[in-house]
């Protein structure tokens, strides 16, 4: 009996070998083919680390004039993701991290994720430009409910490490998030939070420029205000004490005048 079973087993192995390339046993043929083109950016080597991010954040309010807002961009959180959406760095501009808005930590992460996730190599998309598109009656209504923030990335008001290396996600559709580029290749996203969304955008813009990571030769992703620039599907609401490029543009419309 043992001899019979041994013979049957040998026959099965020989038959299996004959179904593939000569002399091989076929395994896992149902697996999909792998892409021959690797990701154009891996890891966090193409974006600022925490040591570089903090001075970029601290120096931004003094560059290119007043940034406006409630605190002139001086109490802020910043987050950076890589091209793959993984969180690479967190920074806070104040020495006491808890002196900033605690809620801004998660918002900064989500802004970085959104800017990276909605931009491509040929077309940057700031979170500010998603504002009108994501309102009721517009084509991206509901987008803010997509890609919820990964709870494994949540941290306290002084936590600068939780979430690093993870895809944190989150979707924010107001100012403060910008995609990062090396030439014409998207390498990640930057998110800033801690003031009005208009000032958040201004601080992020200054940081990206100072880091040399602004897109080259592409359509603008700067913030647009209908009250100043005219109607646009990419328009953002005015904020209290709104500045752009160091020039005051106006204030947010009071609620009783809507």
Predicted regions and their residues:
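C-terminal motif of bacterial Sec signal peptides marking the signal peptidase cleavage site
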Residues: 16-18
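Bacterial signal peptide processing site
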Residues: 20-22
């Amino acid at each position: 009996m043992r001899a019979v079973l041994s013979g049957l087993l040998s026959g099965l192995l020989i038959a299996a070998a004959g179904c593939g390339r000569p002399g091989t046993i076929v395994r896992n043929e149902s697996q999909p083919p792998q892409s021959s083109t690797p990701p154009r950016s891996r890891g966090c080597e193409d974006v600022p680390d925490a040591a570089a991010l903090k001075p970029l954040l601290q120096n931004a309010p003094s560059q290119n004039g007043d940034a406006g807002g409630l605190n002139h961009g001086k109490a802020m959180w910043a987050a950076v993701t890589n091209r793959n959406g993984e969180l690479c760095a967190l920074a806070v501009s104040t020495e006491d991290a808890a002196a900033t808005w605690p809620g801004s930590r998660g918002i900064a992460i989500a802004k970085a994720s959104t800017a990276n996730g909605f931009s491509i190599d040929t077309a940057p998309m700031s979170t500010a430009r998603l504002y009108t598109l994501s309102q009721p009656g517009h084509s991206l209504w509901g987008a803010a409910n997509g890609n919820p923030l990964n709870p494994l990335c949540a941290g306290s008001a002084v936590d600068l490490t939780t979430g690093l290396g993870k895809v944190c996600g989150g979707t924010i559709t107001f100012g403060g998030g910008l995609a990062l580029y090396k030439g014409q290749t998207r390498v990640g996203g930057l998110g800033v939070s801690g003031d009005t969304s208009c000032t958040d955008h201004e601080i992020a813009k200054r940081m990206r420029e100072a880091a040399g990571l602004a897109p080259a030769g592409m359509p603008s992703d700067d913030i647009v205000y209908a009250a100043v620039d005219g109607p646009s599907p990419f328009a953002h609401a005015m904020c209290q004490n709104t500045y752009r490029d160091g020039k005051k543009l106006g204030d947010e419309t009071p609620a009783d005048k809507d």
